[in-house]
Design a protein with these regions (language model features):
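Nucleotidyltransferase catalytic core that binds NTPs
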Residues: 1-161
Length: 161
């Protein structure tokens, strides 16, 4: 269950298919919690990643496994929001969470490997405006924190704006 009493807190959001959830996801969550003093990290499991052609394993099994590997990480909450928000898009999830946790800061978490296609995401520009900070991690290199202004500059360069 995602905690509803997180007023004036910092909440990280890590979305994906989690097929399967693995130590890298846990590592991203722990590093973001430590670096940003997050109260909670929400793993938002999607039924189907719009950028992946393959059919993922059963949602129930993926969710159960994600919860199992986090049994000792009480700050990580695992949930599929698609039935609630009627969308599998990150922009819609962030809008929902910003409304639900009005007085909290939302921190968007993602692997740096997703940055290359970020400009293809529906509502990517809105996501950059709604989230104060992003946490990007490259799994095989040093962890890096990237503030939103720097990220906007990267996106502008990619799009030649």
């Amino acid at each position: 269950m995602v905690q509803g009493k997180l007023e004036n807190k910092k909440i990280g959001v890590l979305g994906g298919s989690f097929d399967p959830a693995h130590v890298g996801h846990v590592r991203i969550s722990k590093l973001a919690k430590k670096n940003y003093d997050l109260s909670q990290v929400i793993w938002a499991i999607t039924k189907q990643n719009p950028f992946k052609k393959n059919n993922p394993n059963d949602l129930y099994k993926r969710t159960a496994y994600a919860k199992k590997i986090n049994k000792n990480n009480k700050f990580i909450k695992v949930k599929c929001f698609e039935e609630i928000i009627k969308s599998n898009r990150t922009v819609d999830l962030i809008k929902y969470l910003k409304k639900k946790f009005k007085h909290s800061e939302i921190f968007f978490l993602m692997g740096a490997d997703n940055l290359i296609n970020f400009h293809k995401w529906k509502g990517y520009n809105s996501i950059t405006k709604m989230c104060k900070y992003w946490y990007l991690i490259e799994m095989d290199t040093n962890q890096r924190l990237l503030d939103l202004n720097h990220l906007r500059n990267i996106i502008k360069k990619q799009l030649n704006l």
